[in-house]
């Protein structure tokens, strides 16, 4: 019945147009790819923070778990935004408008720069939890960035130890305290300009990561 009727262009086999099978790239070079990767990371952090806020409101996470998770996300947000901030993106509000990111709860946390569980007094348990999480991440990030001089590591490590001491809920034999104490002893035997060698950095990262995981297990117990 339809014999002899030619196929309408665009209505038939896409095999006649090999360009339809070509990968569409958002970037033209490595620099552009890194830019989009950085924006995607920031987008993901904000969305995750929004989800965490909703979970806390619905009592799906405990206050301690929420405080630790939110504190980590705030640290990650600051690092991610620094990678994106520039002539195209000057503020997080501008980023959210540009990419239609509707996360009001996350934006409130970002602007207050602290979990909702934290009050202003330094003795508050949630304040201590947030500080411990932030200090663990800060020290580990410094080591990963090859910042390894004694006078650049010891102050944060000492503050981490002091903050853990203020947490009366932590058991006296908590392994994180012992780990930090041992490294403080190592650093105390060094001069200000001395640097940790590669082996020490690797071991310290392993020890602090283990201590940080132990701290999170304690919060979930």
Swiss-Prot record:
Subcellular compartments: Cell membrane; Late endosome membrane
Domain VPS28 C-terminal positions: 124-220
A single GO cellular-component term on record: ESCRT I complex
Keyword Transport: yes
Gene3D superfamilies: 1.20.120.1130, 1.20.1440.200
Protein name: Vacuolar protein sorting-associated protein 28 homolog
Residue(s) carrying N-acetylmethionine: 1
Membrane topology classification: Peripheral membrane protein
Family: Belongs to the VPS28 family.
PANTHER family, alphabetized: VACUOLAR PROTEIN SORTING 28, ISOFORM 2 VPS28 (PTHR12937), VACUOLAR PROTEIN SORTING-ASSOCIATED PROTEIN 28 HOMOLOG (PTHR12937:SF0)
Keyword Amino-acid biosynthesis among UniProt keywords: no
Species name: Bos taurus (Bovine)
InterPro entries (alphabetical): ESCRT_assembly_dom (IPR037202), Vps28 (IPR007143), VPS28_C (IPR017899), VPS28_C_sf (IPR037206), VPS28_N (IPR017898), VPS28_N_sf (IPR038358)
Residues in VPS28 N-terminal domain copies: 13-120
Transmembrane segments: none
Function of the molecule: Component of the ESCRT-I complex, a regulator of vesicular trafficking process.
Gene that encodes it: VPS28
Keyword set, alphabetical order: Acetylation, Cell membrane, Endosome, Membrane, Protein transport, Transport
Disulfide linkage: none
């Amino acid at each position: 019945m339809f014999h002899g009727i030619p196929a309408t262009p665009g209505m038939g086999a896409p095999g006649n147009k090999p360009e339809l099978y070509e990968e569409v790239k958002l970037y033209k070079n490595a620099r552009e790819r890194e830019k989009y990767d950085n924006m995607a990371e920031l987008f993901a952090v904000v969305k995750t923070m929004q989800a965490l806020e909703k979970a806390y409101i619905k009592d799906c996470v405990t206050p301690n778990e929420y405080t630790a998770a939110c504190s980590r996300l705030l640290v990650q947000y600051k690092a991610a935004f620094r990678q994106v901030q520039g002539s195209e993106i000057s503020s997080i509000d501008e980023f959210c408008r540009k990419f239609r990111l509707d996360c009001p709860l996350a934006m409130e946390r970002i602007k207050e720069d602290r979990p909702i569980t934290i009050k202003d007094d330094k003795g508050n348990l949630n304040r201590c939890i947030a500080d411990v999480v932030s200090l663990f991440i800060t020290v580990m990030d410094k080591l990963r960035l090859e910042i390894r001089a004694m006078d650049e590591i010891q102050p944060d490590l000492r503050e981490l130890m002091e903050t853990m001491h203020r947490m009366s809920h932590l058991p006296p034999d908590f392994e994180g305290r012992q780990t930090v104490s041992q490294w403080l002893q190592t650093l105390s035997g060094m001069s200000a300009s001395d640097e940790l060698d590669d082996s020490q950095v690797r071991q310290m990262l392993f020890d602090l990561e283990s201590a940080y995981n132990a701290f999170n297990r304690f919060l979930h117990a």
